[in-house]
UniProtKB/Swiss-Prot annotation:
Its main location: membrane. Glycans are attached at N9, N17, N22. The gene is gpr54. One of its GO terms (cellular component) is plasma membrane. The lineage of its organism: Eukaryota, Metazoa, Chordata, Craniata, Vertebrata. Residues 1-49, 113-119, 182-209, 291-305 are extracellular. This is G-protein coupled receptor 54. SUPFAM superfamilies: Family A G protein-coupled receptor-like (SSF81321).
Length: 377
């Protein structure tokens, strides 16, 4: 989302031209370049692409498994899982179409894929990130609705509705991302020789700040606040009895234990979902906001390192989503075991043995109690 602009591979001074978005890196064009003088090769030139490759591997495998499990098992085709599949699809598109191009920016001195790919990759990156944020918000609203209004949700919360909402999410994401097509372009720069850079070029600083502020609100602040609000309502609602319990101490105690257990599980899920999204996307969003609005901001190698780390954090979110939204759910775990039983043979065998041992112990205790009762009689 922000990686194609101002990715500096030099610790030397950055010269700002024009509106502040066009830049030259390294030596001036007038500087005499000695024979054999080449641009420096930093550790991040290979370390960052290696990290991105790991993200792609984990993310593609995890998200593909999520979609495969949902499509293979009929009982998994629920409204919530439809949103999860949509989220996995956005992550796959992001990982395949955006991450490889971003990874090349670190070992290469500039953009080499032309103006069309500059616009296309940046636009698709913005679309997928926007769709991810809106999908997360829709998932939170869906879970909140089914928790707070369980009876009403039986009529309105269907896979068909989830499909319609998902289509609207994609359409809205395409529309909201159109400014990228207008402002993303190839710009000339100089870094140990003339280079080309794929970056956003706005008519004025006001346009640039307005777009960055929109990105911060629509793609970070609003989803985080909405998710937090929805799950706060869920924590308050989950565990409350829908019917009055009978006057039975055992039932009251059992209900209390279930309430505490469910409330604890939902609270943990809230912490994971909100913190994961906030931690992964927060640094890059705040950095770009600071970069645009802070008047004394100075681009240098230190800020480049911070931005590189922030980009890695945001990209990693696409690989960890399946762990949180998929494999932490009991239904996904069961379906995954059914789909790949050969991976869980040892665990299933141990579970069966433990079950048989427990049954034998229960029968032994029951027999002992029966013998004791006969002796008393």
């Amino acid at each position: 989302m922000y990686s194609s602009e101002e990715l500096w591979n030099s610790t030397e001074q950055v010269w700002i031209n024009g509106s502040g978005t066009n830049f030259s890196l390294g030596r001036h064009e007038d500087d005499e370049e000695e024979e054999g003088d080449k641009h420096p090769f930093f550790t991040d030139a290979w370390l960052v692409p290696l990290f991105f490759s790991l993200i792609m591997l984990v993310g593609l495998v995890g998200n593909s498994l999520v979609i495969y499990v949902i499509s293979k098992h009929r009982q998994m085709r629920t409204a919530t899982n439809f949103y999860i599949a949509n989220l996995a699809a956005t992550d796959i598109i992001f990982l395949v179409c955006c991450v490889p191009f971003t990874a090349t920016l670190y070992p290469l001195p500039g953009w080499i894929f032309g103006n069309f790919m500059c616009k296309f990759v940046a636009f698709l990156q913005q679309v997928t990130v926007q769709a991810t944020c809106i999908t997360l918000t829709a998932m939170s609203g869906d879970r909140c609705y089914v928790t707070v209004y369980p009876l009403k949700s039986l009529r309105h919360r269907t896979p068909k509705v989830a499909m319609i909402v998902s289509i609207c999410i994609w359409i809205g994401s395409f529309v909201l991302s159109t400014p990228i097509l207008m402002y993303q372009r190839i710009e000339e720069g100089y870094w140990y020789g003339p280079r080309q850079y794929c970056m956003e070029r706005f008519p004025s600083k006001t346009h640039e700040r307005a777009f960055i502020l929109y990105q911060f609100i629509a793609a970070y602040l609003l989803p985080v606040l909405t998710i937090s609000f929805c799950y706060t309502l869920m924590v308050k609602r989950v565990g409350q009895p829908t019917v009055e319990p009978v006057d039975n101490n055992y039932q009251v105690n059992l209900l209390s234990e279930r309430t505490i257990s469910i409330r604890s599980k939902v609270s943990k899920m809230v912490v994971v979902i909100v913190l994961l999204f906030a931690i992964c996307w927060g640094p890059i969003q705040i950095f770009v906001l600071f970069q645009s609005f802070y008047p004394n901001y100075q681009p240098n190698y230190a800020t480049y390192k911070i931005k590189t780390w922030a980009n890695c954090m945001s990209y990693a979110n696409s690989s960890v989503n399946p762990i949180v939204y998929g494999f932490m759910g009991a239904s996904f775990q069961k379906s995954f075991r059914k789909t790949f039983p050969f991976l869980f043979k040892h665990k299933v065998r141990d579970s069966s043995m433990a079950s048989r041992t427990a049954n034998a112990e229960i029968k032994f205790v029951a027999a002992e109690e029966g013998n004791n009762n006969n002796a008393v009689n």
